[in-house]
């Protein structure tokens, strides 16, 4: 099980778990567990197998092994850098109640001239409110006691990676669903959509439209697109647009049919983001839709949050419901009473909301 051992030995991204119910020798016990799993002492195969089998029946090993799995999931989860993190604002909430985000605009409009002995005009302000709530997501899996015994824990070697991928995919789906063809965010009244395929001309229109957005007092908000998000089907088109030095456009009938000119879009510093979930979430325009986003540090179109203290996927193990005939406790690795299966569960708490429509723009051929 080299994959499992590699993850065990990779302590990058390690975050100490809660110290509740951990003895003062906990870290030493955890190290001994890792040494046993990885055979750090280079024991002969038959002795290593014997010690593993013995460990499965002890009371400490199941919990320590579960902690190892938990840390592996964290390492695998943090090793992935989802593309959506570039164009959304990230935060935390303290509970499952609806959290409110307020955006105050105004108060910074131009100063009005004040006549001699005249009154100063009041500074007008406007307030926008957004509701953000997180939800709980998860799955459980079970492994038969026989499999654990026969496979020397090899059956669990890719479990951390699978759980980490599941968490990453869940977050990605949620984020993409927030903006993909969002009929509330993208409207003609908002001036942030166009029913045109991705071209240099349509991208110029999008950039100009975002730059022209104003606040409630018709003051410019100095808005500028930083990211262009496309599905895999448009990646090559987007790259060609962003790297081409020249473009060709048609002139009037009296002049030449077409002539080259500079492609200024390539000079705008847009960052290309390819979202593979766009065609999955948006079955209508997912292959042809394209999006622009401002820098979320300036103006956020989307905000996502984890539950505070639970910013990563978490694994827990089901305690055994069996006891010995004499009434003694049996460790979780012995499985449940009915089937002898050993149960694990992964949990993720996550949520998001769309915020300022002026921080994004949508284009597509079938809008």
Name each model feature, range by range:
Residues 1-60, 358-367:
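Intrinsically disordered, low-complexity terminal tails
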Residues 134-138, 223, 339:
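Short, solvent-exposed loop/turn segments at the edges of secondary structure
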Residues 139, 143-158, 162-217:
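Alpha-helical scaffold segments that mediate packing/assembly in large oligomeric complexes
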Residues 180, 224-231:
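A glycine-rich phosphate-binding loop feature that marks nucleotide/adenosyl-phosphate handling sites
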Residues 216, 220-225:
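Short gly/pro-enriched beta-turn/loop segments at secondary-structure junctions
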């Amino acid at each position: 099980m080299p994959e499992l051992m590699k993850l065990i030995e990779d302590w990058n991204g390690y975050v100490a778990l809660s110290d509740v119910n951990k003895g003062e020798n906990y870290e030493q016990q955890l190290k001994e567990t890792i040494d046993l799993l990885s055979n750090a002492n280079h024991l002969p195969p038959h002795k290593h197998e014997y010690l593993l089998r013995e460990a499965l029946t002890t009371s400490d090993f199941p919990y320590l092994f579960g902690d190892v799995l938990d840390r592996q999931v964290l390492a695998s989860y943090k090793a992935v850098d989802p593309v959506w993190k570039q164009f959304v604002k990230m935060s935390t909430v303290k509970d499952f109640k609806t959290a409110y985000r307020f955006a105050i605009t105004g108060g910074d409009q131009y100063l009005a001239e004040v006549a001699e002995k005249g009154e100063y005009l009041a500074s007008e302000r406007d307030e926008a409110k957004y509701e953000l709530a997180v939800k709980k997501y998860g799955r459980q899996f079970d492994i038969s006691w026989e499999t654990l015994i026969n496979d020397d824990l090899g059956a669990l070697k890719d479990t951390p990676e699978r759980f980490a991928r599941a968490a990453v995919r869940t977050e990605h789906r949620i984020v993409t669903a927030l903006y993909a063809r969002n009929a509330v965010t993208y409207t003609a009244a908002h001036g942030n959509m166009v029913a045109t395929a991705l071209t240099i001309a349509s991208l110029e229109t999008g950039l100009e439209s975002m730059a022209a957005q104003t606040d409630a007092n018709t003051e410019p908000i100095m808005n500028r697109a930083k990211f262009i998000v496309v599905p895999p089907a448009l990646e090559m088109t987007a790259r060609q647009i962003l790297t081409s030095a020249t473009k060709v456009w048609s002139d009037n009938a009296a002049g030449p049919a077409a002539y080259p000119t500079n492609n200024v879009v390539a000079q705008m510093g847009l960052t290309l983001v390819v979202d593979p979930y766009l065609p999955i979430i948006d079955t209508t325009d997912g292959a042809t839709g394209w999006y622009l986003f401002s820098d979320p540090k300036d103006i956020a179109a989307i905000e996502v949050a984890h539950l505070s203290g639970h910013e990563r996927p978490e694994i827990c193990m089901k305690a055994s419901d069996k006891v010995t005939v004499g009434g003694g406790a049996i460790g979780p690795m012995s499985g449940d009473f009915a089937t002898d299966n050993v149960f694990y569960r992964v949990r993720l708490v996550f949520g998001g909301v769309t915020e300022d429509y002026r921080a994004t723009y949508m284009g597509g051929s079938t809008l």
